[in-house]
Structure formats: C-alpha cells, structure tokens
Amino acid sequence: MTDTRKPPRKKPQRPAKPAAPREKATLHPRNRHQGQYDFAKLIKSSPELAAFVILNPYGKESIDFANPQAVRVFNRALLKAFYGIAHWDIPADYLCPPIPGRADYLHFLADLLAEDNEGVIPRGASIKALDIGTGANCIYPLLGHSDYGWQFVGSDIDSTAIAAATTIVKANGLSKAISVRQQANRRQILLGLLDSSERFHVSLCNPPFHASLEEAQRGSQRKWRALGKADPKRKLPVLNFGGQSQELWCDGGEIGFITQLIQESALLPSQVAWFSTLVSKASNLPPIHSALKKAGALEVKVVEMGQGQKQSRFVAWTFLDKAQRAPG
C-alpha cells in the first residue's frame, strides 16, 4: 500500500534574531534633562560654551567629557539655563558632577518624603535637608532648592570646598536657603556636626568610592579607556573628571564610609527622619543591610536609578515610625 502521507514540513530556516539592545535606563519623570540638549539654547544663555561644542561619532552636538574645562563650562550653562543659577564655578581639580544624575537622586528622595505626606511632595522652606560632603560644587543644595524650595545645610571636611560653596551660595543670593559648614573632625561624619536641637527631614550623601589613591587612579584610567583616551605611557594616570583625594577615596572605601555613616546615624536617630546615601557598587548592599540591621534601623529602602547605560542606587533608612517622620 502506497504511503500517501505528506512528509513533515521543514521549518524554514530563519536568521538568528539579533539580541535586542539593552534599553537605556530613563531619568526620573520630573528630571529637567530629558532627551537631547538644545545646544543653541545653551549657547545663547552661556556664549562661552560654544568654544567647547563638538560633533560626536553620531553627528550630534556634544562636548568632550574628558576635558575638565569643557565639563565645567557645560555644567555652568546647564545650571543657568535650567535652574537659574547665574554664578557657578569650582576650583581646578575639584569634582565636577554630572547634573542629570544628581537631580535624579533628589527627585527620588522627594518621592520618598511624599510617602510620609499622603502622596504629596513636600515643598518649601519648612523642609530641611542635610547634604553630607557637599563639595566645592554645592550641587545638591542648588538643585534641591531650585526644584523644591527646600532649605539645605551642606557639610564638608575641606576648607577650600567650603569656601567655594559659600561663594556660590552668596553670589546667587541664596544665603537664607543654603548654609555650609565644615566638619572639623576629619574622622567623623555626623558627630560634632549638628546642634542637638537641629532636625532634618532627609540627609543625602555621595560617598568616596575608593579605598586608596591607587584604586582611584585605576578607576580614572578605566574612564579614560571608555572614552578612548587612555595614555599607555602613564603607569599611574592623572585623576581625571576632577576630584580631590577626600572626594574620591577614604580608608575602607565606599563600604567603610557608609558603615561609619550608619553607625553614627544610630547615635542621632531622631535628628534626621530619613538618612540616605548613594551606593555605587551593588555588591556592597548585603553588608550595608547587615550594618543597618545591627544599628536597629526601623525601615530600609533601596531605590534603583538609571541614567543612559549607567545604573545607580541609593539606600535610605530611618529609626522613626511614619507618624514621627511626617513633614509638618
């Protein structure tokens, strides 16, 4: 008997489906820096920026982010155009921060405070924020006051940074909204910094990432390579992207600094409703959680953020219940 069954159809061979490109992490919805920058508009308000504008490999206007002077002028233009900060400058070799990422931290902190305020973001001078390690750039107080009207105290151990930040604050007429003070004891973070009567709704911190100068230099070299600008002749690269030693490294590195911050926060549990810090390395989260448990934190939150291909996060913790934390 003849087999009339049709042979099984072969599945047509299709080319392998290309892997989808990783989605770029998006900025917080309230972040002012969505999409491409309008360089014509930036140059109109800050003509000095024109000298630093280049075309990137995609034919788009940009700047050379390996050039500290270009980054400084670019930041000055952004602060003027987006935040009304007319006067901003920092000493040579001090940290020049990426503004969109710094703004994101503040927006997510505002969301955190809203959770204790019936979903409404608290705004105005009644909200007090403490910026630990404000730096010469004073960036968090400037952005936070512009976006939300909060009052800020910025602290630092570096007298030059304090002087530069104070100059920025005074030049922009913000002395009633932002104050800066020096932590006199370089071995302490919070202790000895605050008056016993002071109360803050939130604290924020961008801690030193590295545990030594050599580690910081290797990190700088990786950034050079990412920009295709590594100098193979240098055994130890110059610290690029700005940053004094105390801004980039400390004994114990990021985890050492954050652990000390947690320990000191437990000694001042009612003076800050929500303590927080950026955490650059996700691998540091387990020991941070352990330190917070040991310190007796009542509630802990990890908030993931992303700018472009970069992922970042901050940890927030409190020793107070919701009723005690409510802005008022």
Swiss-Prot record:
GO terms for cellular component: cytoplasm. Keywords: Cytoplasm, Methyltransferase, rRNA processing, S-adenosyl-L-methionine, Transferase. It comes from the Bacteria. It catalyses: adenosine(1618) in 23S rRNA + S-adenosyl-L-methionine = N(6)-methyladenosine(1618) in 23S rRNA + S-adenosyl-L-homocysteine + H(+). One of its GO terms (biological process) is rRNA base methylation. Residues 1-31 are annotated as: Disordered. Its EC number is 2.1.1.181. Pfam families: Methyltransf_10. GO terms for molecular function: 23S rRNA (adenine(1618)-N(6))-methyltransferase activity. NCBIfam families: PRK11727.1. Belongs to the methyltransferase superfamily. METTL16/RlmF family. Specifically methylates the adenine in position 1618 of 23S rRNA. This is Ribosomal RNA large subunit methyltransferase F. It comes from Pseudomonas syringae pv. syringae (strain B728a). The lineage of its organism: Bacteria, Pseudomonadati, Pseudomonadota, Gammaproteobacteria, Pseudomonadales. The gene is rlmF.
